[in-house]
Amino acid sequence: MQNTVLRLRTSTCHVTRQRLLFFVSGVALSALVLQKDTAEAQETNASTVLQPIVVQGTAATKGARVEQRGYVATQSASATKITTAISETPQSVSVVTRGAMTDRAVQTVADSLLYSANVNGQRYGNDPRSDYFSIRGFGADLYLDGLRVPQIANQTGGYAGFRVEPYFLNRVEVLRGPSSALFGQTNVGGVVNMISKDPSETAGGEVYTRFGSYKQKEAGFDVTGPLGADSDLTYRLEGIIRDSETMNDFGKNDRFAISPTVRWSPDEDTSLTVYGAYMKDDAGQVPSLIPAVGSIYPNRLGLTIPRSFSDGDPSLAIYDKETAYTGYRLEHAFNDDLVLRQNFRYSYLDVNYQNLFGNGLSANQRTLSRLVYNAQPTLNAVALDTNLEYRFDSGPISHTLLGGIDVQWQNLVNRTGSRSGPTLDLFNPGYGIGVQPAALTTHLDQTQRQVGFYLQDQMELGGLRLTVGGRQDYVSNDSDSTALASGLTTRYRQDDSAFTGRVGAAYVFDNGLVPYALYSTSFSPVLTLTPTPLKPTKGELKEVGVKFAPQGDDFSLTLSGFEATQQNVVNRVASVYYQTDEVRVRGIELEANATLWDSLNLTAAASWQDPVVTESQTPAQIGKMPYTVPKQQQSLFVSYDLPMPDSWNGKLTLGAGVRRIGRTAGDTANSFFVPGYTLVDAFARYEHDRYSFQLNGYNLGDKTYVAGCNTPTQCYYGQGLTVVGTVSVKW
């Protein structure tokens, strides 16, 4: 139902950035002061390094939070909300450990996923505003410690997207396939669940400096330990500051981020973790939108658009973003069989986005038309999840029952305006022309509320593992769109509800072989930057596979075949979102991780899939490939600790990786295709006592390639050769 009223509604929830920053800074200052007392109270050794976390809390979840140097993880909490052996989980799960992230010197969450099976980690190149990635050809959902990170249009990325700092993370887990039966809002492709570093009972710390390509200068720190001798309080304080340019002229990749965490553990059955984070980003001119002609295909003039080309202007190159979140995680075990958990987080985002970008190419194939765009989004979000875990036996069957309720609330206020801008010569650009910002013309106020009730039973009978779960969701979406010139408001109201379920079975053989099968459904309401609400996405997954973990912590392999179908798939062209009726993806995936001889780590992945539009209101799109979805991907990353003479008193580690992304469709009509590409990365690290010296290189061949396209005039170059050096000191 739609009506028009003369009223402008503002956000119903507002917490000032100054108060959030005051909160974060206060906790940080307290932790730093108490660190001095802790250091004096403990006997230290100069050769001691930052120890792996001694996890406090209940056994139900601590296994998935332990820091790991190797590449093989054995447990995950993403698939079931309870720490479960990955090999016994009837679903494809990957874990990128802290050790793997350190070896690759990842600077974004998307970077950490570049070697995971069937994850396209840079579908639009390297964008300092947000992380863009997809799983199995569908937009992925982003979670932090089991709670959903606010997202626009059910996709990571976008100019109003959160970008969590990877230095604050212990691991990144990839759950392929929907998890709506537990988490609620998830796409059929899967979930990326980021696990934060926890405070440690052992005092330690790290400081580092980093220099690299594009004039990058960065420094960071991570300190942790108990808050006083014999204290039941522990803390962790992390922070980074970066000043950097980007591949594109007038682009920036500046960041300041800080994250304090305090944990109270009065006994072995109870823990309360209170945390916060504040991040401020300055991206300047956003990555360039370039035409396919002159980048993928030859220009009739015989000219190629350089990678450093900017479609903007330094007089209007503004992208400033502030994000913050704070919350708590509570666990209490009443006894060995009954555990209560509650997870709460409040999130805030504010963006000032004023840019000039390309949106068309003239017939002469060198004159670029441009759009002046102005957006001022503010997002407030609250998430609360409460559940009970109960373990019991019914005859020969062991049960782990999980039931709970979660509540999610999001309010997005976005003021936008746009107009045609001055044209630009692709091959002889003139900059510094004094472009004025576009006037704001529209005020959008959207509020989304969701309540979900879920129940899951994990059953064991001998080697059989059976997981059955279901969830009922109720969602409302209120949207007011006001024309600022007239004051007229158009109001939309949308209510939805859905039941989603999951049934999975696996059989654990003594030799480590685990065949499994899974059926799961998904449901996800959509919050957008446009006035008219989009339909919720719905999907289903059928998956069979086999896992092999013969040596416990040393080796793991997963081979899976799947068919994923999703209705109302959300797509994006520039800042406009629209939906495709139905997309189906059938595929095969293989991923292996190994830690051998305590010196060799490797991760290998390969995927082959057939993505196709099966239903559309535009008949010509049926049978076509969705854009930015590769049919195949392969990758391999290996690191090796070289034997060193005892006299060196150090360790030398060398590593290298190769990743291949197959060709993708460049638009919905499949009128052209983006060629596939192969990239090589490498690193070397020397560790001596408390000191570490590391050098990383990405795209060592300096290959020029296009990462993806939405239309013939909206393509994105991939990152060129990038070199980064890091020096760190641990204690």
Language model features with spans:
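Structural signature of Gram-negative outer-membrane beta-barrels, strongest in the C-terminal barrel
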Residues: R263-D267, L379, S398-L402, D406-Q408, ...
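Surface-exposed extracellular loop regions of Gram-negative outer-membrane beta-barrel proteins
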Residues: D282-S295, N411-N414, R502-F548, D553-T580, ...
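Outer-membrane beta-barrel translocator/receptor signature
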Residues: Q151, Y167-N170, A181-I258, P266-T270, ...
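C-terminal beta-signal and adjacent terminal beta-strands/loops
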Residues: Q2, R659-D667, R685-W731
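Gram-negative outer-membrane beta-barrel transporters
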Residues: E563, T580-T668, G701, T726-K730
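Acidic/polar loop-and-plug regions of large Gram-negative outer-membrane beta-barrel proteins
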Residues: R242-T246, I258-A333, Y348-L379, P422-Q450
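Acidic, small-polar-rich N-terminal luminal/periplasmic segments of exported/outer-membrane proteins
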Residues: Q51-T202, V544
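Membrane-embedded beta-barrel scaffold of Gram-negative outer-membrane proteins
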Residues: E331-A333, D337-R345, L349-N355, P536-D598, ...
